[in-house]
Amino acid sequence: MGGHLFLFRDGEIKMSIITQMVLPFSAGVAGNWYHTLTNSSTVNVNALLKDSSSKLCPIIHWNAIWHHRIATEIATQIFDGLRVQEDLVQKYRKKYLRMFSTLPLKSNKSFSYYVGACSLDAITKNYDKTNLERLQSITEELSCDGCFIEGTHYSIYCTETIGRAFSLLDQFYGQDEVWILIKERIGFVTKWQRRVSNTEGVVASIGDSWYEEVKPIDEEGVYEYLDMTIHRISKWVIIQNHRKSKFALHEHPHLDEVLIAYGDKWIVQGSGMPSYKQVMANPLKWRRPRNHFISEGVYDIPWLWRLRKKENRSRSVVTNENVIRIIDSGYKTIRWPIDDGVRYIATSTKVQWVYNGCKFTCSGEIDAIQEDFAYQSVRYREEKKIRVVRIQGKNLQTSVEPCL
């Protein structure tokens, strides 16, 4: 019961769709529809709404984000001048509002559902305060203090989703105090995204994520959030994680991990994920806490690592223009990446090695050195295996400086 679709083109009388007889569009088919709507003028939206609105508004769907984005896109295109039969849009809105929206869970999926709902409210001039208030509640929880609790990729998904409909929503809701709160929160998230990016705008891989870009920002300072402290000095961006927020979808065991960028290059970017397909094929591989450059603990097991989130912070960062230092207090086993084919130079008080164009030097009372590995997403559907050096000792200090 597969799905094929024939797009309406200029000169044709009708768009025909052969789809599943019972099930709604799959995530893949819905995704194709969304991208077709955004990139082509060949889709007859009247015919789409008439022939397949039940397929576009599934009552239950495991991952309905593309259906949400289709609703937002249709409303926005109408706002931009597309002519559609008003009764079809009204019927579509009513069906959409009956769609399962991952309630009561507040997540990127429920966020995009309510962006779609508010967009349809706006384009049909139905001032439903309930939808707007629910969107504000979800936005407040996800955005926290600006540091998006589901990580960089899903923060970009949410800001792009609401950004597409921003002019429509802003014109309709205007000075509504709830809408003003939503705009303020989205502004905080956008600023955070830029603060966790390097000089080219490539963001850190926080949570389920991969190589993505935002508009770079030219600012220096130390920015304290509940879940991390961001240090921006000269060409350095250092993200000192200290995750405290409660459970969130797509959360990773960053714990006390330190992420490092120098100029346009990420030295330690974060594990992320290459794609759902690859993660689900090897869940233990991609949910392995020691894919991250954390100080090790007894609960470094998939899903149990959250028991470590309440640990006291015993890691600090010192920055200057040329060298940064990561200071680990007490007795620990720490992890850092090392280039393939490179030997580390070790004594009882110092270990030196090179990774990604930077020289690492770890000093302190060193008891043991071992090797391990980690996995990292590079771009969407791309991954690499990273060689790791594990250093066990007391009061360890790691300096990082660019190679000449």
Residue ranges of model-derived segments:
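Catalytic Cys-His active-site segments of thiol-dependent hydrolases/isopeptidases
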Residues: V268-G272
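Short, conserved secondary-structure transition motifs
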Residues: N63-R69, T102, T190-N198, A346-K359, ...
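Short, acidic/polar N-cap/turn motifs at the starts of alpha helices
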Residues: H4, L226-I230, E257, R290, ...
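Carbohydrate-active enzyme catalytic cores, enriched for enzymes
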Residues: Y113-C118, H153-I267, A374, K385-N395
